[in-house]
Protein backbone atom coordinates (compact mmCIF):
# COMPACT_ATOMS: atom_id res chain seq x y z
CA UNK A 1 0.00 0.00 0.00
CA UNK A 2 2.88 2.37 0.80
CA UNK A 3 4.46 1.71 -2.61
CA UNK A 4 1.13 2.42 -4.33
CA UNK A 5 0.79 5.71 -2.41
CA UNK A 6 4.33 6.78 -3.36
CA UNK A 7 3.80 5.94 -7.04
CA UNK A 8 0.45 7.77 -7.11
CA UNK A 9 2.04 10.83 -5.48
CA UNK A 10 4.96 10.77 -7.94
CA UNK A 11 2.61 10.57 -10.92
CA UNK A 12 0.43 13.39 -9.61
CA UNK A 13 3.16 15.61 -8.15
CA UNK A 14 2.32 18.42 -10.57
CA UNK A 15 -1.32 17.45 -10.88
CA UNK A 16 -0.85 16.99 -14.63
CA UNK A 17 -2.55 13.60 -14.71
CA UNK A 18 -5.88 14.77 -13.34
CA UNK A 19 -8.51 15.53 -15.94
CA UNK A 20 -11.08 18.18 -15.11
CA UNK A 21 -14.19 19.16 -17.08
CA UNK A 22 -12.81 22.57 -18.04
CA UNK A 23 -9.65 21.02 -19.45
CA UNK A 24 -11.66 18.57 -21.55
CA UNK A 25 -13.83 21.36 -22.97
CA UNK A 26 -10.80 23.57 -23.66
CA UNK A 27 -8.97 20.73 -25.40
CA UNK A 28 -11.97 19.93 -27.58
CA UNK A 29 -12.39 23.60 -28.52
CA UNK A 30 -8.70 23.92 -29.36
CA UNK A 31 -8.76 20.89 -31.64
CA UNK A 32 -12.08 21.67 -33.28
CA UNK A 33 -12.03 25.46 -33.52
CA UNK A 34 -8.45 26.59 -32.94
CA UNK A 35 -7.11 26.46 -36.50
CA UNK A 36 -7.31 30.19 -37.22
CA UNK A 37 -5.81 31.06 -33.85
CA UNK A 38 -2.96 28.59 -34.38
CA UNK A 39 -2.27 29.93 -37.88
CA UNK A 40 -2.15 33.49 -36.51
CA UNK A 41 0.16 32.40 -33.69
CA UNK A 42 2.55 30.67 -36.09
CA UNK A 43 2.60 33.76 -38.31
CA UNK A 44 3.33 36.00 -35.31
CA UNK A 45 6.12 33.74 -34.06
CA UNK A 46 7.64 33.65 -37.57
CA UNK A 47 7.55 37.47 -37.51
CA UNK A 48 9.34 37.48 -34.15
CA UNK A 49 12.00 35.15 -35.54
CA UNK A 50 12.48 37.35 -38.61
CA UNK A 51 12.69 40.43 -36.37
CA UNK A 52 15.36 38.74 -34.25
CA UNK A 53 17.34 37.65 -37.33
CA UNK A 54 17.30 41.19 -38.74
CA UNK A 55 18.35 42.60 -35.36
CA UNK A 56 21.33 40.27 -35.15
CA UNK A 57 22.29 40.79 -38.78
CA UNK A 58 22.30 44.58 -38.33
CA UNK A 59 23.50 44.98 -34.75
CA UNK A 60 25.29 41.78 -33.71
CA UNK A 61 26.44 40.12 -36.95
CA UNK A 62 29.22 38.16 -35.27
CA UNK A 63 26.58 36.05 -33.49
CA UNK A 64 24.89 33.62 -35.91
CA UNK A 65 21.24 32.80 -35.28
CA UNK A 66 20.45 29.17 -36.00
CA UNK A 67 17.40 28.21 -38.08
CA UNK A 68 14.27 27.39 -36.11
CA UNK A 69 13.53 23.71 -35.71
CA UNK A 70 9.76 23.73 -35.35
CA UNK A 71 9.60 25.70 -32.13
CA UNK A 72 9.82 29.21 -30.71
CA UNK A 73 13.14 28.63 -28.98
CA UNK A 74 16.02 30.24 -30.84
CA UNK A 75 19.64 29.16 -30.54
CA UNK A 76 22.28 31.88 -30.81
CA UNK A 77 25.91 31.00 -31.42
CA UNK A 78 27.96 33.10 -28.99
CA UNK A 79 31.27 31.32 -29.43
CA UNK A 80 32.77 34.50 -30.93
CA UNK A 81 32.32 36.33 -27.61
CA UNK A 82 35.66 37.53 -26.37
CA UNK A 83 37.48 35.05 -28.57
CA UNK A 84 41.03 34.12 -27.75
CA UNK A 85 43.69 34.10 -30.44
CA UNK A 86 42.80 30.47 -31.19
CA UNK A 87 39.16 31.43 -31.84
CA UNK A 88 37.80 29.79 -28.69
CA UNK A 89 35.42 31.81 -26.57
CA UNK A 90 36.95 33.21 -23.41
CA UNK A 91 33.45 33.93 -22.08
CA UNK A 92 31.43 30.77 -21.68
CA UNK A 93 27.70 30.56 -22.26
CA UNK A 94 27.12 30.06 -18.52
CA UNK A 95 28.93 33.31 -17.71
CA UNK A 96 27.14 35.13 -20.52
CA UNK A 97 23.77 33.83 -19.31
CA UNK A 98 24.54 34.99 -15.77
CA UNK A 99 25.60 38.44 -17.00
CA UNK A 100 22.40 38.78 -19.01
CA UNK A 101 20.29 37.71 -16.03
CA UNK A 102 22.00 39.79 -13.37
CA UNK A 103 23.10 42.80 -15.40
CA UNK A 104 20.25 43.18 -17.86
CA UNK A 105 17.43 41.23 -16.14
CA UNK A 106 17.09 39.13 -19.27
CA UNK A 107 16.39 35.43 -18.85
CA UNK A 108 18.02 33.14 -21.40
CA UNK A 109 19.19 29.54 -21.16
CA UNK A 110 22.81 28.51 -21.38
CA UNK A 111 23.51 25.85 -23.97
CA UNK A 112 25.39 23.83 -21.37
CA UNK A 113 22.02 22.96 -19.78
CA UNK A 114 21.38 20.75 -22.79
CA UNK A 115 24.53 18.68 -22.69
CA UNK A 116 27.73 18.35 -24.69
CA UNK A 117 27.89 20.63 -27.70
CA UNK A 118 25.84 23.34 -26.02
CA UNK A 119 28.80 25.34 -24.73
CA UNK A 120 29.00 28.70 -26.45
CA UNK A 121 25.30 28.82 -27.30
CA UNK A 122 22.38 30.52 -25.61
CA UNK A 123 18.71 29.76 -26.12
CA UNK A 124 16.09 32.51 -26.25
CA UNK A 125 12.30 32.13 -26.08
CA UNK A 126 10.62 34.37 -28.68
CA UNK A 127 7.00 33.45 -27.82
CA UNK A 128 6.22 36.91 -26.46
CA UNK A 129 4.88 40.28 -27.62
CA UNK A 130 7.20 41.85 -30.19
CA UNK A 131 7.75 44.93 -28.00
CA UNK A 132 9.03 42.68 -25.20
CA UNK A 133 11.32 40.87 -27.64
CA UNK A 134 12.66 44.19 -28.96
CA UNK A 135 13.37 45.38 -25.41
CA UNK A 136 15.15 42.14 -24.55
CA UNK A 137 17.28 42.30 -27.69
CA UNK A 138 18.26 45.90 -26.90
CA UNK A 139 19.35 44.83 -23.40
CA UNK A 140 21.29 41.92 -24.89
CA UNK A 141 23.05 44.25 -27.32
CA UNK A 142 23.89 46.67 -24.49
CA UNK A 143 25.60 43.92 -22.56
CA UNK A 144 27.43 42.58 -25.59
CA UNK A 145 28.70 46.02 -26.57
CA UNK A 146 29.70 46.97 -23.03
CA UNK A 147 31.20 43.77 -21.68
CA UNK A 148 32.02 41.46 -24.55
CA UNK A 149 33.59 43.73 -27.14
Question: Residues of each region from the PLM?
Answer:
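Residue-level recognition of strand-loop junctions within catalytic nucleotide-signaling folds
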Residues: 1, 32, 77-79, 127-129
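Conserved core segment of the aminotransferase class I/II
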Residues: 1-46, 53-55, 144
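Conserved glycine-rich beta-strand-loop-beta hairpin in the small C-terminal domain of fold type I
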Residues: 21-24, 28, 43-53, 65-81, ...
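Non-transmembrane alpha-helical segments in soluble domains
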Residues: 28, 53, 57, 75, ...
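Surface-exposed helix-capping loop/turn segments at secondary-structure junctions
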Residues: 36, 56-65, 148-149
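A short linear hydrophobic-aromatic micro-motif
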Residues: 53, 62-65, 107-112
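PLP-dependent enzyme catalytic core of the Aspartate aminotransferase-like
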Residues: 89-95, 99-108, 114-149
Amino acid sequence: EEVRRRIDRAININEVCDVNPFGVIATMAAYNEGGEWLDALRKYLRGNYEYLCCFFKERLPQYPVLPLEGTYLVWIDCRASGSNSDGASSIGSDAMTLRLQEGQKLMVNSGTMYGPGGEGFIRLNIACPRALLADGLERMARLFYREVF
